[in-house]
């Protein structure tokens, strides 16, 4: 592993052993602490990322999508992924966006998002959609700043919470 300067923040593709587990665990721990979710959050993230990695192995090449991690001082502190949007052919779906609080405010969230959007453009997607839940104000601000617009908002029971599930879309 290359040495990094103190405070060094990077984004790279999640291809190292432990990357997926770390990002899934971060989702489980941080969402439980910050929003009160249960263990199904971590399981949902782990299952989706595992499905992506296994599909990439079957299909070869770029497969159905990619996953990136954010690192701070060489430690994984977040991640984001882009997959084909099953519900909207010709579009991508942004998934698993998260940053540890110690890494927030350093531009890493924007870098993860821009990396995923660059991949969507390279795949010639007509747009990108994402699903989120109400109350994730910092994430929603980041998405809106990138041009995403709220298109669906509905009550839902997700991850042990009564919440509002939201879909946001960005035309490319």
Predicted regions and their residues:
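Residues that form or flank phosphate/diphosphate-binding pockets in enzymes
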Residues: 89, 107, 138
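C-terminal "cap" of GNAT-fold acetyltransferases
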Residues: 3, 16-19, 126-172
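Acyl-donor-binding surface of acyltransferase catalytic domains
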Residues: 1-8
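Active-site acidic-Proline motif in GNAT/NAT acetyltransferases
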Residues: 100-106, 134-135
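Acetyl-CoA-dependent GNAT
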Residues: 9, 13-102, 110-115, 119, ...
């Amino acid at each position: 592993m290359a040495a990094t300067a103190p405070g060094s923040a990077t984004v790279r593709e999640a291809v190292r052993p432990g990357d997926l587990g770390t990002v899934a665990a971060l989702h489980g721990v941080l969402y439980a602490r910050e929003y009160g979710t249960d263990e199904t959050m971590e399981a949902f993230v782990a299952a989706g990322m595992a499905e992506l990695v296994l599909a990439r192995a079957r299909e070869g090449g770029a497969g159905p999508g990619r996953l990136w991690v954010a690192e701070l001082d060489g430690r994984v502190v977040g991640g984001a992924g882009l997959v084909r949007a099953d519900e909207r052919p010709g579009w991508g779906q942004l998934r698993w966006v998260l940053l540890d609080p110690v890494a927030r405010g350093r531009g890493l969230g924007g870098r993860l998002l821009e990396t995923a959007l660059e991949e969507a453009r390279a795949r010639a997607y007509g747009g990108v959609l994402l699903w989120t839940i109400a109350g994730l104000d910092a994430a929603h601000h980041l998405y809106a700043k990138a041009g995403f617009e709220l298109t669906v908002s509905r009550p839902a029971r997700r991850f042990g919470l009564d919440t509002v599930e939201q879909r946001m879309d960005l035309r490319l």
